[in-house]
Amino acid sequence: MRGGESIDTSMGLTPLEGLVMGTRCGDLDPAIPFYLAKNLGMDNQALDDLLNRRSGLLGLCGVNDMREIYRRIAQGDPTVVLALDVFCHRLRKYLGAYWIELGRLDALVFTGGIGENDAVVRARTCAGLEGMGILLDEAANQSVGKGERRVSRSESPVAVLVIPTNEELEIARQTLEAVGG
């Protein structure tokens, strides 16, 4: 956001572009669907199903529930470690791209299910980004809380915030605006 206006999104025409998600692939080499069609005989419907519903975390490690991922990490499963590495790497990659596009960063906001509830993903995303002015407060990050909260250190040039989302309320607001209410 710049001046209250969105300047970009990680999604393209569809949510397939961008970040790795629970079941969606995120960015991938455009030749992959052609390769799969040619070498595995996959048709358009099979490719759509694979990329939208059987990829992402699910495709990388077999599960898309972060609780199960952490349970399996504790058991030493290397596939879930890889999946979490890929997930956080993509977050950091997009964060860096947006930082460059904006020219500076005032705040890094974590929202949505994982952003609001997963201290490990927040910590791994922020790790090593002190040069960007992101100084995470580990204790604040680990604390469980509801509502908006700051999880960066007080001296952090960039505020790191956890802000709960209310998608239903936003949909209702936009619907009301669209119908002229």
State the predicted function of each range.
Residues 1-2, 111, 163-164:
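Short beta-strand segments
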Residues 81, 85-101, 105, 115-181:
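Internal helix-turn-beta structural module
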Residues 1-38:
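Glycine-rich phosphate-binding loop of actin/hexokinase-like ATP-binding domains
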Residues 28, 52, 64, 103-105:
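Short gly/pro-enriched beta-turn/loop segments at secondary-structure junctions
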Residues 25-29, 40, 44, 62, ...:
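Generic structural signal for well-ordered, non-membrane alpha-helical segments
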Residues 32-36, 46-50, 68, 97, ...:
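Alpha-helical scaffold segments in soluble metabolic enzymes
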Residues 40-83:
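A mobile "lid/hinge" subdomain adjacent to the ATP/sugar-phosphate binding pocket shared
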